[in-house]
């Protein structure tokens, strides 16, 4: 597996297209546990978006976004659940270039190494933030695109298997609660 050490900035480009005509109504947030979610879910059905969303940034499928002040808790995600949406202007948005498989980068963002690297690059004393430049300066070991795809697919398969097992465990727990309730009425 041929690898080379490069920097994330060699493989991504910042996006900042705005919702100028307010045509996109799907306001999204990035959660550290669920990735992109509709803002109404993040804030329990409260409307926190501005009435004027013309300055909000447009994100499309496979684009990434993060809140610079919340990345230290894992609030960075790739859009996979919607075709497009808009995020607050404070978010930093970017996409991968053709030489980086988005899923590979997505899994890298879940790694301990990534969190160690962002800790080195946070700026500010009270509210520590990661700039786009700070993200771009993080080293990244890049195999060929074909190997990236293989790694991404394998990790996705494992994630699906884990989800199935979790779902099965929840089913067994519900059955147990039901039986306990029936037995000890």
Predicted regions mapped to residue ranges:
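Non-catalytic DNA-recognition/assembly elements of restriction-modification systems
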Residues: 1-21, 137, 141, 145-146
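Amphipathic alpha-helical coiled-coil/heptad-repeat segments
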Residues: 1-6, 142-185
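Sequence-specific dsDNA recognition surfaces
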Residues: 9-20, 28-61, 87
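A short beta-sheet element
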Residues: 54-112
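A short glycine-rich beta-alpha junction/loop motif
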Residues: 69, 85-90, 123-146
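Periplasmic-binding protein-like
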Residues: 114-117
């Amino acid at each position: 597996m041929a690898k080379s050490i490069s920097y994330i900035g060699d493989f991504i480009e910042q996006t900042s297209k705005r919702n100028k005509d307010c045509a996109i109504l799907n306001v999204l947030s990035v959660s550290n546990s669920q990735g992109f979610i509709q803002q109404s879910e993040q804030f329990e059905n409260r409307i926190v978006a501005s009435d004027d969303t013309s300055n909000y940034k447009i994100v499309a499928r496979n684009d990434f976004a993060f809140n610079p002040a919340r990345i230290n808790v894992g609030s960075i995600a790739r859009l996979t659940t919607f075709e497009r949406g808009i995020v607050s202007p404070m978010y930093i948005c970017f996409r991968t270039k053709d030489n980086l498989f988005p899923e590979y980068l997505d899994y890298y963002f879940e790694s301990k190494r990534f969190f160690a690297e962002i800790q080195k690059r946070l700026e500010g004393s009270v509210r520590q933030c990661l700039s786009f430049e700070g993200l771009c300066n993080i080293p990244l070991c890049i195999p060929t695109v074909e190997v990236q795809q293989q790694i991404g697919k394998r990790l996705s398969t494992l994630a699906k298997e884990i989800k199935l097992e979790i779902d099965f465990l929840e089913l067994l727990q519900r059955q147990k609660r039901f039986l306990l309730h029936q037995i000890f009425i």
